[in-house]
């Protein structure tokens, strides 16, 4: 994985989720604050980080920062992937692409999103998703700029943020940010809402496993990895949903 230097979540969650026989290795790009300037400076370090990982002869690389890519607009995820693959000739997954592909695999066209970002960066992500063909029915963002502060959150914060979304018209719920801890609450949230709930990290891992041909279900971390609910339309396979809460923040508008 290639992660921001201040990311303390992605490696921890991946090591918890991946089955035996796999090992996780990472290289870091310097970034402390989630600002446009810092994100661009960080992104310029991606090839150096990929070269370091290539020395370990890894099978697949995951670029683990959603907002650094989506804030640059639709198509930049492909730019990042091609840049890394051209440099090291290793299959590469970009988190932004993985999230879109995972939502499509679930049959989700309408989503509600929980994020930790500042409002400006959050809206850049929502625009990216809309341009990829998704409808945003609701969102909530926490306005946090310091990346370590996001990593220090309990997974319960992600859960409460998701619970505050108006999910009545959603096909799936997304916890967006590789630094926002959430793996331990995904199954619980699916049971409460009756909807697929995925995170940037579970989508990235799902896509990386697909790139290397691994298709065995992984249980305990949401239906995307377990295969319990293979589409948003199949959400009746999950436990009975509870009534959605009143939204804290209104539906997204341009």
Where are these regions (language model features)?
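Periplasmic-binding protein-like
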Residues: 59-64, 112-114, 170-177
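Conserved beta-alpha
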Residues: 80, 84-145
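Hydrophobic alpha-helical
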Residues: 160-192, 204-205
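Short, glycine-/small-residue-rich phosphate/pyrophosphate-handling segment
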Residues: 1, 105-127, 213-235
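Short, flexible loop segments at boundaries between secondary-structure elements
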Residues: 144-149, 195-217
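Short, well-structured alpha-helical segments in soluble
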Residues: 43-56, 157-170
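Glycine/small-residue-rich loop that forms an oxyanion/phosphate-binding "nest" at active or ligand-binding sites
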Residues: 50-97
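N-terminal glycine-rich anion-binding loop in soluble enzyme alpha/beta folds
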Residues: 2-48, 117-154
């Amino acid at each position: 994985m290639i992660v921001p230097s201040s990311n303390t979540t992605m490696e921890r969650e991946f090591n918890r989720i991946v089955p035996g026989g796999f090992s996780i290795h990472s290289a870091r790009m310097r970034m402390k604050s989630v600002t446009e300037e810092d994100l661009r400076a960080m992104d310029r370090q991606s090839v150096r980080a990929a070269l370091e990982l290539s020395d370990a002869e890894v099978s697949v690389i995951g670029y683990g920062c959603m907002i650094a890519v989506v804030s640059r607009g639709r198509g930049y995820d492909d730019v990042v992937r091609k840049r890394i693959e051209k440099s090291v000739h290793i299959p590469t997954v970009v988190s932004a692409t993985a999230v879109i592909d995972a939502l499509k695999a679930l049959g989700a066209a309408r989503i509600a999103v929980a994020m930790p970002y500042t409002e400006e960066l959050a809206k850049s992500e929502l625009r990216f998703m809309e341009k990829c063909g998704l409808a945003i029915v609701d969102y909530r963002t926490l306005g946090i700029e310091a990346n370590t502060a996001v990593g220090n959150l309990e997974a319960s914060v992600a859960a409460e943020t998701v619970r505050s979304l108006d999910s009545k018209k959603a096909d799936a719920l997304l916890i967006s940010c590789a630094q926002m801890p959430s793996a331990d609450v995904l199954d619980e949230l699916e049971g409460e809402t009756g909807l697929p709930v995925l995170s940037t990290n579970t989508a990235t891992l799902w896509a990386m496993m697909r790139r290397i041909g691994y298709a065995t279900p992984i249980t305990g971390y949401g239906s995307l990895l377990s295969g319990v609910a293979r589409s948003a339309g199949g959400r009746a396979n999950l436990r009975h949903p509870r009534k959605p809460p009143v939204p804290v923040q209104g539906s997204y508008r341009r």
